[in-house]
Amino acid sequence: MINSIRIGTRNSTLALIQTNLVIAQIKQFFPDINCEIVPIITSGDLIQNKPLYDIGGKALFLKEIEQALLDKKIDLAVHSLKDIPGRIPVDLVIAAVLEREDPRDVLVCLNYKSIETLPQNAVIGSSAVRRKAFIKKIRPDLNIKVFRGNVDSRIKKLMTGEVDATILSYAGLKRLNAFNKKYCHLIEYSQILPCVGQGVIAVEIRKDDNAMFNICNQINHIPTFELIKPERAFLEHLDANCSTPIGAYSQYLDAYNIQTDFMLGKLDCNKIIFQTEITNINTSRECGIKAAKMMLAQQ
């Protein structure tokens, strides 16, 4: 019987909150296991003055954590699923996810409640090319400023007038207890499609660690695990990075069928392709691959 688990995570307030949510799930099934949080500073945390697509993509938020996992310095890692590239090291696996939080984006703005009502040539802070593509589609006149850092720092920049608005994920704001209806306005899926895996907390382990597999099997939220399969397959087949605007959102039509909306764009944001697929849960991965192939052919 395992007595303790070393859990690796980024050393940010949100990452630590998410890690404690995983620990709470573990404790429900294994109350006697001691869970030690191992905060790890990643390259993505250190480099804040450049867009992610210029410095290696979201994998920079995982590199050091995954290496610690491979080196057996930690037993499992907790990530935001949206930060995990389509392809991960062959010796690692996403073994569990928690129940998905609402994956919508949020317009954070003091004086306006929607992208459409922002003043002409307003400045939006964002570093995500997916959001940039949608913003340019909705309002080509808007200016987009590279905007990185944690949620608190981005909101502070907004409050001091550095930008007119920014876009953040609802899941992160909610977990930080930072969603304020006075200046946080939900954006519907029909306007901005979420990032692949947005709103999902993922647990990554070594493939050969049977003890961790047993724990992950207990805490895994199977409905969410099934939902993310077409999204992740889409991402994996595209082998996309932060320079490719892509999005995907899956939802259950009933107990056995999933509808997934996909989007694929170009860095210059001149073209966005959309596709919707409906599939049985048993063939959901194939659905994501099919969508990727068809959409690549349209580019």
Curated annotation (Swiss-Prot):
Pathway: Porphyrin-containing compound metabolism; protoporphyrin-IX biosynthesis; coproporphyrinogen-III from 5-aminolevulinate: step 2/4. The keyword ATP-binding does not apply. One of its GO terms (cellular component) is cytoplasm. CDD domains: PBP2_PBGD_2. Its EC number is 2.5.1.61. Its cofactor is dipyrromethane. One of its GO terms (molecular function) is hydroxymethylbilane synthase activity. It catalyses: 4 porphobilinogen + H2O = hydroxymethylbilane + 4 NH4(+). Binds 1 dipyrromethane group covalently. GO terms for biological process: protoporphyrinogen IX biosynthetic process. Keywords: Porphyrin biosynthesis, Transferase. InterPro entries: HemC, Porphobilin_deaminase_cofac_BS, Porphobilin_deaminase_N, Porphobilinogen_deaminase_C, Porphobilinogen_deaminase_C_sf. Pfam families: Porphobil_deam, Porphobil_deamC. Coiled coil: none annotated. It is an enzyme of class 2 (transferase). The modification S-(dipyrrolylmethanemethyl)cysteine is found at residue 242. Tetrapolymerization of the monopyrrole PBG into the hydroxymethylbilane pre-uroporphyrinogen in several discrete steps. Monomer. The porphobilinogen subunits are added to the dipyrromethane group. PANTHER family: PORPHOBILINOGEN DEAMINASE. Belongs to the HMBS family. This is Porphobilinogen deaminase. The lineage of its organism: Bacteria, Pseudomonadati, Pseudomonadota, Alphaproteobacteria, Rickettsiales.
